[in-house]
Amino acid sequence: MSYPQFGYPYSSAPQFLMSTNSLTPCCESGGRTLPESGPAAPAQTPVYCPVYESRLLATARHELNSAAALGVYGGPYGGPQGYGNYVTYGTEAPAFYSLNTLEAKDGGGSAHAGISPAAAYYPYEHSLSQYQYDRYGAMDGGTRRKNATRETTSTLKAWLQEHRKNPYPTKGEKIMLAIITKMTLTQVSTWFANARRRLKKENKMTWPPRNKCSDEKRPYEEEEEEEEECSQEDAMKSEKAEEPTGKEEKELELSDLEDLDAAESESSECEMRRPFPHPHPHPLPGGGPPPRAAEPPAAAAEEEEEEAAERARGCLKPAAEECEAALLGARPRGCEAKLCFPQGQPLLEAKPRIWSLAHTATSLNQAEYPSCMLKRSGGSAAAAVSAPVSVMDRHQDSPVTNLRNWVDGVFHDPLFRHSTLNQALSNTTVSWATTKGAILETGALGRSVGNGANVLKGQLANLAHQDSSKEFLAFPKAGSKMFCS
């Protein structure tokens, strides 16, 4: 009869000798062999081994009975699956297990008489495979984690009762308690944390608090970690206490930055305007400009007018150069008026305001002119008019004279200095003055006006015949406008 629950294809013959004589050798001849060896196995040499004592056999029998009862060596992992390799020791293995026939008859079935076949087969557990017949591998109930019971926690309660003044076990004490109670180290730490929390709620604290930072909130940490957490919380509290002063310092820094931004914006706005040298006959000893508040009002007004004139000259100089190039390189187009300044061309942004050239040219009130246009009007008019004309007559001169005075004031006479248009305008002005003098002397209004018109036509015709390759500037009509953009 074989026992498939062990996985060994052995017969019911006993495997251990029951003799108490330790000196009697066990001699065997070529007897039975295992089925794996085959029927034609050669005869084996006898092997001598000491006989086991009864106390060793009793212990082994007890362990085999417990292992069979647990069913951990069931049939699914029998000999065909390779489990029998643990008891196979090469080609001479049958010599160890083949017994004498007489001893087999005398003690038949005595070794496994108390073993009953297993009712069910359990799966193979790998964690116990390395312990074949070891008592620690077969007994797995006490080594596994289980819930804490009253029997296990009684030891912890006794330790807590003895250490009411300091219920914080060290790491070594926790390990010792875990071994005694068969609990894990985490379970022991959690139990003590819960016990301390429960005592605090019941107002049964008999120990001083640890800086208001106990391990109830962190039941899985050790004392060293708790102390580190306490130090970190203290550092955080000190940082929070220092936060208001830090905020005030940041606000002060921001206010300083705002002041710097305001100063930079003011300086950038001031840089948009071109600086003008301050004409002062007596500078200060320190080298700085004198204060403007000390100047008289009239001097301040004159200085502002001069600055405006300088700005106007700086704005109109490039436009004058373009106009001169256009007049010298263009072809004659009859009596069409050519605009010297394109309407869409923008001037510099530093110009204080925009003037209308048509309004300035046709205006008879020189008080409306800007200061830059009135600077050289008197001198240029005296140079242009050859005949002696009084101041009252100059205000009532022809439009050519007004336009010439305005052009001289703006362009400083760079354009009409060496051109035929300059001569034509001068002749026209002289003829206009002569005609007006004849009107005043004779009183014949109609004939004088006719003679004046004929003279003007003749002068214009002579101008066209003299230089037909250059343009002349015609007078704008009543509805036309000239722009300086």
Curated annotation (Swiss-Prot):
Renumbered residue ranges of the record's region Disordered: 206-313
Top-level lineage group: Eukaryota
Compositional bias segments (type: Pro residues): 282-294
Ligase found in the keyword field: no
InterPro entries: HD (IPR001356), Homeobox_CS (IPR017970), Homeodomain-like_sf (IPR009057), Iroquois_homeo (IPR003893), KN_HD (IPR008422)
Compartments where located: Nucleus
Acidic residues bias spans: 221-232, 254-269
Composition bias type Basic and acidic residues, residue spans: 234-253
GO biological process: cell development; heart development; neuron differentiation; regulation of transcription by RNA polymerase II
Keyword list, A-Z: Activator, Developmental protein, DNA-binding, Homeobox, Nucleus, Repressor, Transcription, Transcription regulation
CDD domains, A to Z: homeodomain (cd00086)
Portion annotated as DNA-binding: 142-203
Gene Ontology molecular function: DNA-binding transcription factor activity, RNA polymerase II-specific; RNA polymerase II cis-regulatory region sequence-specific DNA binding
Tissue: Ventricles of the heart, developing feather buds, retina, hindbrain.
Recorded GO CC terms: nucleus
Classification via PANTHER family: IROQUOIS-CLASS HOMEODOMAIN PROTEIN IRX, IROQUOIS-CLASS HOMEODOMAIN PROTEIN IRX-4
Family: Belongs to the TALE/IRO homeobox family.
Biological role stated in the UniProt entry: Regulates the chamber-specific expression of myosin isoforms by activating the expression of the ventricle myosin heavy chain-1 (Vmhc1) and suppressing the expression of the atrial myosin heavy chain-1 (Amhc1) in the ventricles. May play a critical role in establishing chamber-specific gene expression in the developing heart.
Protein's name in the database: Iroquois-class homeodomain protein IRX-4
